[in-house]
Amino acid sequence: MVTMRDLLECGVHFGHQTRRWNPKMKKFIFGERKGIYIIDLQKTIRYFRYTYNIVRDAAAEGKTILFVGTKKQAGAAIKEFAEKCEMPYVNHRWLGGMLTNFDTIKQSIRKLEVIEQMETDGSMDLLTKKEAGMLKSKKAKLELYLGGIRNMKNLPDMVFVIDCVKEKIAVKEANRLGMPVIAPLDTNCDPDVVDFPIPGNDDAIRSIQLFCQEMSEAINEGKALRDQDSEEEIQNKEQDEVSQEEKDDILDEAMNEEDFEIPEDKE
């Protein structure tokens, strides 16, 4: 779980310049220093821990959380920590309709799979050099934009976003579909579009890494709880089945041995 020391070391408290802010963020601002807003880390840590528990519980229920962050500072962290918790991600360009027109996106993912199959089964070798080159170029483009969501068979249950201002289209699509949005809120953000906000710096690399790492750890913790519950359910089910079988056996014995008597103790 994140600590105040973690937040300070990663610069989570540094907001934007005072001229670049959203007045709705006033309640999360501690003060101003040298023209920069300072975020109230007491509120940050409270929201952080609350959101951590929300994400952990969602993962324990088997829900899918989509990681989104396409700006330069966020791309590597989004990919790294989404993969660590085996969640889908978008870390390059957000294609309009990725959520609201997901059926079309799935068709594009299918095209990627077909091209890969052509490479595997030798179909690509039967094409002209130009045709093969065009397909490889298309494959590279599809991998770049859709590689992180290629295994996402259905719409996600939640969306974790780095920089909800830059990713406003993704946030808008999630809002439209009623998907909860999780996001760090810098001082230029609109808190009204985020369901589970964490006030904090969404520009510094270390801060972004901390947010992504904590969400990834929350998901893995939730998955571990889910696996544990599943094992206990299986064990309990097996135990119940054995117990019922023993009861049936004893009942059969009783029904077939009407004259059964308990032997007297021998002296």
Swiss-Prot record:
Transmembrane segments: none annotated. GO terms for cellular component: cytosolic small ribosomal subunit. Disulfide bonds: none annotated. PROSITE patterns: RIBOSOMAL_S2_1, RIBOSOMAL_S2_2. One of its GO terms (biological process) is translation. Residues 223-240 have a biased composition (Basic and acidic residues). InterPro entries: Ribosomal_uS2 (IPR001865), Ribosomal_uS2_bac/mit/plastid (IPR005706), Ribosomal_uS2_CS (IPR018130), Ribosomal_uS2_flav_dom_sf (IPR023591). Residues 222-267 are annotated as: Disordered. It comes from the Bacteria. GO terms for molecular function: structural constituent of ribosome. Keywords: Ribonucleoprotein, Ribosomal protein. Residues 241-267 have a biased composition (Acidic residues). PANTHER family: 30S RIBOSOMAL PROTEIN S2 PROKARYOTIC AND ORGANELLAR, SMALL RIBOSOMAL SUBUNIT PROTEIN US2M. NCBIfam families: rpsB_bact. Belongs to the universal ribosomal protein uS2 family. This is Small ribosomal subunit protein uS2. It comes from Campylobacter hominis (strain ATCC BAA-381 / DSM 21671 / CCUG 45161 / LMG 19568 / NCTC 13146 / CH001A).
